[in-house]
């Protein structure tokens, strides 16, 4: 399967669309009027369910304009290939003012990413590297 399959759960739902030929993501829209409370979060309905192409998963990502102009971010959103429920976007308002979303507003973007799911092998040792166990800024800031 090479197509992104979309099922409209609500007649007024908007089909995900790319904003330009080179756009990485498909804009997804709200099917409801909601308020993202100041410094709060809410799961916003899109009125669609999807089936991603084989070998991929969907990632719900912020729209740069909403993030830059209004401080609206998107929290965790991984859409597994076997998930068939409604696609929702968890929006987080980083500002001190409520943000109003109207039905039909583009709220996030769906990015399809290839995924590798190798078998897990338990080993007694891992090979050494120059970095070793250094993390959290160990290679510089």
Curated annotation (Swiss-Prot):
Lineage of the organism: Viruses, Varidnaviria, Bamfordvirae, Nucleocytoviricota, Megaviricetes
Enzyme Commission number(s) of this protein: 3.6.1.23
Alphabetically ordered keywords of this record: Hydrolase, Magnesium, Metal-binding, Nucleotide metabolism
Pathway membership, UniProt: Pyrimidine metabolism; dUMP biosynthesis; dUMP from dCTP (dUTP route): step 2/2
One matching Pfam family: dUTPase
GO terms (BP aspect): dUMP biosynthetic process; dUTP catabolic process
Organism: Paramecium bursaria Chlorella virus 1
Cofactor(s) for this UniProt protein: Mg(2+)
Keyword RNA-binding in annotation: no
Organism superkingdom: Viruses
Name used for this protein in its record: Deoxyuridine 5'-triphosphate nucleotidohydrolase
Class in the EC hierarchy, top level: hydrolase
Example GO molecular function: magnesium ion binding
Catalytic activity field: dUTP + H2O = dUMP + diphosphate + H(+)
Function: This enzyme is involved in nucleotide metabolism: it produces dUMP, the immediate precursor of thymidine nucleotides and it decreases the intracellular concentration of dUTP so that uracil cannot be incorporated into DNA.
Family to which this protein belongs: Belongs to the dUTPase family.
């Amino acid at each position: 399967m090479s197509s992104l399959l979309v099922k409209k759960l609500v007649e007024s739902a908007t089909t995900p669309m790319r904003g330009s030929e080179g756009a990485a993501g498909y804009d997804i829209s709200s099917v409801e009027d909601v308020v993202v409370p100041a410094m709060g979060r809410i799961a916003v309905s899109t009125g669609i369910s999807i089936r991603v192409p084989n070998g991929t998963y969907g990632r719900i990502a912020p729209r740069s304009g909403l993030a830059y102009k209004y401080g609206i971010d998107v929290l965790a959103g991984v859409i597994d290939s076997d998930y068939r429920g409604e696609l929702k976007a968890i929006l987080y308002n980083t500002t001190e003012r409520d943000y109003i979303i109207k039905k039909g507003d583009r709220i996030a973007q769906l990015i399809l990413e290839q995924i590798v799911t190798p078998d897990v092998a338990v080993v007694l040792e891992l090979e050494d590297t120059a970095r070793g166990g250094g993390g959290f800024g160990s290679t510089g800031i």
